[in-house]
Amino acid sequence: MTDLNELKLFATTPHPCSYLDDRDATTVFIDPEVSVDQNLYSQLTNYGFRRSGKHIYRPACKTCQACIPIRVDVETFTPNRSQQRCLRKNKDLTVTVVSTIDTDEHYTLYAKYIERRHSDGDMYPPKRDEYRSFLSAQWGVTKYLEFRNSENSLIGVAVADQLKNGISAVYTFFDPNEQKRSLGVYAVLAQIEWAQKQSNRYVYLGYWIKECQKMSYKTLYKPFELFINNQWLTFI
């Protein structure tokens, strides 16, 4: 097992926060020269790190602790009424786990999603090379959950990394025209179900930010755990 205390970390200079407009952010990255495998990646995820492409990072802001790592305990998870409705609404969908999404069909859906939902974000305009590098990991732990309707049309994809004790939800994109399906919610529920089928314990959802609406939804999947003061605490 790799000694995490021996890993080199590189910190960015303070920069405008992507989630809270009135704050600056500092991010630490794992040395890109480190050889990463599933064991090390799982350890780092358990300590609150995330992946973006080949880079593994964690917030390290001096004056703010708003980004809190969150994970769902799939052994005790129970969907609430709204989530149960979402499951019923999407019972016609077929979920398939695949090993690659480097196809025109998948990229077209991704580009449509970015153009319609995130035209003000860092990934706009969509580019295929960035699509490839952002969503996949060089150490080969990434899988993709496809969502197809009864006509076999691709309407959503959840990108997830397989860990030793669970899965890490990396990114989700879907057809913006299917808004009534609540596919963002469905993608989390599908990943929880996938983890359960694999006898995994957790689904890591990244960072919960109470003051950021687009990140605060993560506490709706209960019970959940938050990584506070270097320990995971359960909230029911």
Swiss-Prot record:
Its EC number is 2.3.2.29. Its main location: cytoplasm. GO terms for biological process: ubiquitin-dependent protein catabolic process via the N-end rule pathway. It catalyses: N-terminal L-glutamyl-[protein] + L-leucyl-tRNA(Leu) = N-terminal L-leucyl-L-glutamyl-[protein] + tRNA(Leu) + H(+); N-terminal L-aspartyl-[protein] + L-leucyl-tRNA(Leu) = N-terminal L-leucyl-L-aspartyl-[protein] + tRNA(Leu) + H(+). GO terms for cellular component: cytoplasm. GO terms for molecular function: arginyl-tRNA--protein transferase activity; leucyl-tRNA--protein transferase activity. It comes from the Bacteria. InterPro entries: Acyl_CoA_acyltransferase, Asp_Glu_LeuTrfase, N-end_Aminoacyl_Trfase, N-end_Aminoacyl_Trfase_C, N-end_Aminoacyl_Trfase_N. Keywords: Acyltransferase, Cytoplasm, Transferase. It is found in: Cytoplasm. Functions in the N-end rule pathway of protein degradation where it conjugates Leu from its aminoacyl-tRNA to the N-termini of proteins containing an N-terminal aspartate or glutamate. NCBIfam families: PRK01305.1-1, PRK01305.1-3, PRK01305.2-2, PRK01305.2-3. Belongs to the R-transferase family. Bpt subfamily. This is Aspartate/glutamate leucyltransferase. The gene is bpt.
